[in-house]
Amino acid sequence: MTNLSGKKSLNTVTLVFKLPYYTQWGQSLLIAGSEPALGSWNVKQGLSLSPVHQGNELIWSGRVSVATGFTCQYNYYVVDDNKNVLRSESGEKRKLVLPEGVQDGDVVEIRDWWQDASEALFLRSAFKNVIFNGSENAKRELKTTSLNKSLEPEDIVVQFIVSCPRLGAGSTVVVTGSNPQLGRWQTQDGLKLNYVGDSIWKANCLLRKSEFPIKYKYCKISEAGVSSLEFGPNREADVDLSSPKPSRYVLLSDGALRESPWRGAGVAVPIFSIRSNEDLGVGEFLDLKLLVDWAVNSGFHLVQLLPINDTSVHGMWWDSYPYSSLSVFALHPLYLRVQALSDAIPGDIKDEISQAKKQLDKKDVDYEASLASKLSIARKIFKLEKDKVLNSSSFKQFLSENEEWLKPYAAFCFLRDFFETSDHSQWGRFSQFSKEKLDKLVSEGTLHHDVICFHYYIQYHLYMQLSEAAAYARKKKVILKGDLPIGVDRNSVDTWVYPTLFRMNTATGAPPDYFDKNGQNWGFPTYNWEEMSKDNYGWWRARLTQMAKYFTAYRIDHILGFFRIWELPDHAATGLVGKFRPSIALSQEELLSEGLWDFDRMSRPYILQETLEEKFGSFWTVIAANFLNEYKKQHYEFKEDCNTEKKIIAKLKNSSEKSLWLEKEDSIRRGLFDLLQNIVLIRDPEDSTKFYPRFNQEDTSSFNDLDEHSKNILRRLYYDYYFARQENLWRQNALKTLPVLLNSSDMLACGEDLGLIPACVHPVMQELGLIGLRIQRMPSEPNLEFGIPSQYSYMTVCAPSCHDCSTLRAWWEEDGGRRSRFYQTVIGSDDEPPSRCTPEVANFIVKQHFDAPSMWAIFPLQDLLALKDKYTTRPAKEETINDPTNPKHYWRFRLHVTLDSLLDDKDIQATIKELVTSSGRSFPGKVDGAEESGEKLAKVQLNGKP
């Protein structure tokens, strides 16, 4: 036994750590902790554990000598032979406090269980501070656990430790078991545990050596005295009495009290889509209070939103796209309620607000008009109240706490308006950001200081209004779930202030998938992860910290981007000809060894005269004359001024020959893009000896005109690149970045994992406790047309649709053949399906999702309104929020009913709540979420004397 405590003390105790854990070959376990005895959090200096087989378990154990007053934090780690971390525990750091009475020479045995990510979920703020309302636990009297009795030689002190976050007000936890001290399985006589904080309950029990082994279980007892025994087999504890010096104290750190899986439900709607009696043509933060009330009445524990950050890049309706952030910290002025800016709004401004309400009360959102109206009114109120607000203590505190992002944001907005562009490369000497320039721009002595302060003022009120709505939701036990976009606009505050964090010569997108057969190009620059890692991803940590001010859960948009991103050159307009970053490319040497040598033939557009004739008919000569050069007989290449997608778009738009193709511009552009994309390999622009297989290469004539030997090699290399060789690289990449996000806040994290999913994604998400997404029409199983909700895994969110696809009603109407197949295979009827999605059909599909095993069932509000004929009068296509195939889609969908009127409709709220309750999902007002089934099981097991 080694003394690693780093302390000189005559009074020492021996700690024996034990943990059951099955490892793979080459793996081992160690402990790292806060004290020198455990490496001071340096894993390589931690306490190594040794494995021993005991029955069906592999027990890892280790000993260390420490001082009698020793306390520490610690965690277990799976490491390789070089002590590199392969896996670490989830949740809070473990805390070790030795029991009172431990004396010099005692042996204290600590028996732990590996902390899985799924267990740690219920310690996240969504559960701890909202659903299970941590304030109830905070109100509990914290008690110490002591015996007040001197020990005899045959005595062993057992400390029971269990986590129980799912506990109603007034409830307690007991341990019941096989011996008298534990009540002989009578829960009312069990050993009561003391609450010690952070959802942890403890109690000491004095047992004689002869009483081992013991069997026991934990049990919740409600304020009314109703017992709910934990699920699963009996827990067991024994001591090794054959040891020369057996353990005097045994700490049974048993993890979480075992309960039936908690399941909840929620509603999803963009803020801009909300309609209320108070809004100015678009939903507002304060409307969330109405939405929360409706959610509670309908049995929902969660409200999910789209991104809410400022997107004011172009100064027009293009900015309606909520995923293209001007700032990842600033809130969007569109969601401001101007009526709440002051308690003393003059009559003329009130009249202007009333007039604006009438003018903006349209079927869809008028993005430009609503934003302009709000900013105009806000400026007038600002002029009247700026001194009062800017000198208030709450504003000064807001500015002080947020100045790191707020001042650059305000300066950016001023410069954007001054130069009439958000492209900061056109701002002259202000193109390059510096702290000195910023300080001058926002200093009080400038002529434009009021403009700077106006942006502060707007952000302050947005913060106050969203904070009010968030506090209201927490009070009502409703989670607000935000959305973390994968990218930022290339003309944004963030790329101006932190240019080295972004690869500005690239664009982010997605390869062809369900959403778009041509792939997607979102235009965001990709991230420079290597640079971001230098400060442990500080920019990301700041983003999550800011989000956590309002939200207790969030959706990670395109979580695949944290494994690998689909990177496109900045001259691309579509998303087809990209490559994954990071990825292991096909090297020139590798291709040569396979017998592939004509790299130019495979990596440049393959354009033959016969292809031109086939694609453009008799018009091919005009196309060739304007866009192509014939470099050898009947073989063509693009001219320099149109050899990229963006150049083609510009030439079609500006050419003097435009009259020749005006009516055919779209088809000509598509045809030229097809020619440009007619390649087999993509040459790396940064290393000409590296290549990447073009996605769907077999769809090209470039591939089809190759010899069979080359085709077979390319097929094999294609599969290897996309589905094999990258898996470990992508796993390691995700394990570098995602844990930083998850540990930056205590929000509950969900990942949007739709599209082309590498095999490594779901295991990593499971390991990290990330909740996935399942959309019925987009099954992750390759051989299914429709997902089967009853077979979804627990760690998922299930939904019949989402904002990136048509609603349930529209989907039903789109394709008659698909509708018939769904009606037959899913609903189970051979009858002719109705041509429209009736409330009965909607009810069946919605109920499928409520009944699913998924932790969350979250429904777009449009799909819930389909449950009642009254709300299905609007054409279904008009309810679609986004069309991913259109990069310039106008995000303007607005509900055709107000939240006020929905709150008055008791019938639909009752219909939805009945679906929630009958599915066994938790709802606001229901305690614990699983009492009934727990009580039934408890009665069965107690009567059977487990």
Curated annotation (Swiss-Prot):
Catalysed reactions, as listed in the record: Transfers a segment of a (1->4)-alpha-D-glucan to a new position in an acceptor, which may be glucose or a (1->4)-alpha-D-glucan
Annotated GO CC locations: cytosol
SUPFAM superfamilies (UniProt xref): (Trans)glycosidases (SSF51445), Starch-binding domain-like (SSF49452)
InterPro entries, alphabetized: Carb-bd-like_fold (IPR013784), CBM20 (IPR002044), CBM20_DPE2_1 (IPR034840), CBM20_DPE2_2 (IPR034841), Glyco_hydro_77 (IPR003385), Glycoside_hydrolase_SF (IPR017853), Ig-like_fold (IPR013783)
Leading EC class: transferase
Location in the cell: Cytoplasm, Cytosol
Gene Ontology MF annotations: 4-alpha-glucanotransferase activity; starch binding
Domain of life the protein comes from: Eukaryota
EC number: 2.4.1.25
Record PROSITE patterns: CBM20 (PS51166)
One of the GO BP terms on file: carbohydrate metabolic process
Entry's family note: Belongs to the disproportionating enzyme family.
Function: Cytosolic alpha-glucanotransferase essential for the cytosolic metabolism of maltose, an intermediate on the pathway by which starch is converted to sucrose in leaves at night.
Protein name: 4-alpha-glucanotransferase DPE2
Organism whose genome encodes this protein: Oryza sativa subsp. japonica (Rice)
